[in-house]
Amino acid sequence: LLASSNNEFNARFPGVKIQRQPVHTVYGGANLFKTGTTEKLSKLAQSHFATYATDHKVMAEMLGLPAADIVGDDSSHSITQRVFDRVKSKLETEAVEDHRVDFEDGYGSRADDEEDGHAVSAAIAMAEDHKSGALARSTGIRIKSLAEETKHRSLRTLDIFVSTLVEHTEGKIPQPFLVTLPKVTTPEQVDVLCQYLSLLEQKHGIPSHSLKLELMIETIQSIVSTTGQINIPALVDAGADRVVTAVLGTFDYTASCNIAGNYQDHMHPAADFARQIMQVSLTGTKVTLCDGITNVMPIAPNRGNALSDRELAENKDVIANAWQVHFGNIMHSLRLGFYQGWDLNPAQLPIRFAAVFYFFLTGLDDASARLKAFIDKASQASLVGNTFDDAATGQGLVNFFVNGISCGALTEQDALEAGITLAELRDRSFLKIVENRSKSD
């Protein structure tokens, strides 16, 4: 009985793995998606960062970071200098990690002929970029919801897009390719979409499960079912191993909670409640967590080449405020264990990377020292038969490195310098590390 139960548990909860997880998903309307969109977004992000962060001190000022992080022991190795250098390099090499062509809120409701046309044109553009290697590492589309009023339009767009994409790529779907389902309310919606994806794969002769699912948790019914049960596990189970990510739709969710528009916010307690339900439902499974958007855009109100000092100062203030709001929201997500989020505008990308790098780099030295000390003390204690009661803390430190490496903020060398081997890190278990070292000693 126990063996069967334990095996079932381990299969469902294999643990957090060291595997690449995007730090963001960038999405934009399907009508705007053209050949070279990823490169265009990258250049816009680089230009924005170069304009408003001329060096690490200016970046720190714009973000409102502590002065201690700017100076450090050696200004060339200060936290902000390291963050600045990594952000600049990241924007030049891979500014967009994950991209979604949007047929929902970022696109709107249009005439059928118009949406049909955009489904074709966006799919052709994606096919061309796929063949030239210009796509983001991860890509996909967001369809409309499968609610009664949009279900037919949603599946029609999906069919047109996938069919056109397959036609122009000789049957080679970009991998990973995610289909994002918004405003989920019932497992039946996920089940129907899963069956439809299977039919598309069979129709076009592409490998089974080439089309993955991403579920948006943005209704109260996606959190709690009509029978009062937590609904997220049932939604994932209905996806038949296709579901790879669950995304919090912050503003739709808070709206569904009947919260007034001027109080809807990334950090609203209702949003944190949803995050925690997602976390306890999915952490340790094969489904990763992704947070929602920041709706304050870093867009300068004054344009042109001959701006007055007042206009330039106004631009800087608006941009700095947007940076700080976005940075604060991302740091909030990271502290809660959400290492990925959605971005709306290329000007938000530098701040995404700055927040992720800052989060891990500011904690690196302390985590390294504590992990090394914990492992050493645990090994010694186990040799004399004493009980080691700080396993939870040790596991948290291991998780820090696992998550930092998975999102690209830390390197495997950072972990090696903390005294942990790559094999031990891939085991993801602090207790196993201690046990194995105790045996070897």
Residue ranges and their predicted role:
Residues 1-441:
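Expand to "…catalyze enediolate/carbanion chemistry for C-C bond making/breaking, isomerization
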